[in-house]
């Protein structure tokens, strides 16, 4: 998941730190040292991660937009200037803006806030922001919780005793609470020095940036892989005392199934599966990046000559048009499949299903799936022209019939236009007109969209006034009748199961004969 590093460059970060030796350090130097350590780790183990660098004081500035070039990020650390007072709220607003602009509101993001624990002074300080949080309008709301899935990690260039001497720690903890409890505060253990800063950032790396290594198994074939991004623990909301479920480091393939049968299932998350080549001594080859391009190329050449099960699996799934079902834990499955980035490039991906014995209802229970050879006859037919899926449920599904869907404005517009087209062809299209009218009426009542009924009634009355002199007399009667019935349906006394029927007129018989 993307990372935004938010660096405090206010005057308080220039406070000197007494460190052994002749060189004088400031708190911002300690912060830059810790971030350099983080960037070096990510360049080696998280090189697919996108990272952005934001600096702030009373205002915020995007120093480096989202990038995978960690050399650029490290250069920006050495080019930061000092500014005025601290305003954490402006920094959080900046994070909201750049993440939503780049990734939208659905992609999880990690925010690493590096500060010295000073909250600012007066208006714009964190104390003032938290005190006035509940007195704001919606357009000026406090930026937490972030409008996207996130974790907020606060790296304090101060020890716990210094923060507890004021209310700084309490205010920073409020930030984590406002972010739905997603995140953590890190402080320096002991005196402020480079070693203790490294230790603090090491804890962050262990918590959030440790690569997930696993062993992919299929029978006697195995491969060491890295799953990126790291799968997050999943909590089942229905449980009384929920315990986070974590996937196993042994990923065992339990079977294969056609892509058409798996269709497009709901998943919790998607991950890249990257092979890790090992040499005879068990050291990683070709994993991560090195400073020396020649060493990197030679390592990649060595890794490319070693047979790897991941390559075999990826190619087979791509050619055969199948997916592999993989067991992640007790009653928890996922699928491995090939996904194309472009016409020439594709990747081995893994998607995680929701935990449970039956994550995909149309496949039935995972434990009851078996090989084709166990069936008395081929369930796919001799010519591969049929499929045993989807399994037909015993009970009638509520979604078995055609339903009205207005997810997009175009769907609603199409249904209204269909009614108007039939209205202009009355009385020949009387039955079709009332069929579409009743379908729209029921959908509008189900959604509570009463204004739609009033609007369509007004449109029908307008169509009635626009009828040409050559129009059949029955058309005007039917349009007026339909408009009146829609207006009645828009009241609180409307009955959902009631159907609007055509008005019987002296002209109805002749129109029916023409139909």
Curated annotation (Swiss-Prot):
PANTHER family: INTEGRATOR COMPLEX SUBUNIT 14, PTHR13532
Keywords: Acetylation, Magnesium, Metal-binding, Nucleus
Annotated organism of origin: Mus musculus
A single GO cellular-component term on record: integrator complex
Identification of the protein by name: Integrator complex subunit 14
Compartments in which it is found: Nucleus
Job description of the protein: Component of the integrator complex, a multiprotein complex that terminates RNA polymerase II (Pol II) transcription in the promoter-proximal region of genes.
In-chain residues carrying the UniProt-annotated modification N6-acetyllysine: 418
SUPFAM superfamilies recorded: vWA-like (SSF53300)
Binding site for Mg(2+): 10, 12, 86
Assembly and interaction partners: Component of the Integrator complex, composed of core subunits INTS1, INTS2, INTS3, INTS4, INTS5, INTS6, INTS7, INTS8, INTS9/RC74, INTS10, INTS11/CPSF3L, INTS12, INTS13, INTS14 and INTS15. The core complex associates with protein phosphatase 2A subunits PPP2CA and PPP2R1A, to form the Integrator-PP2A (INTAC) complex. INTS14 is part of the tail subcomplex, composed of INTS10, INTS13, INTS14 and INTS15.
Pfam families found in the cross-reference section: IntS14_b-barrel, IntS14_C, VWA_2
Signal peptide residue numbers: none
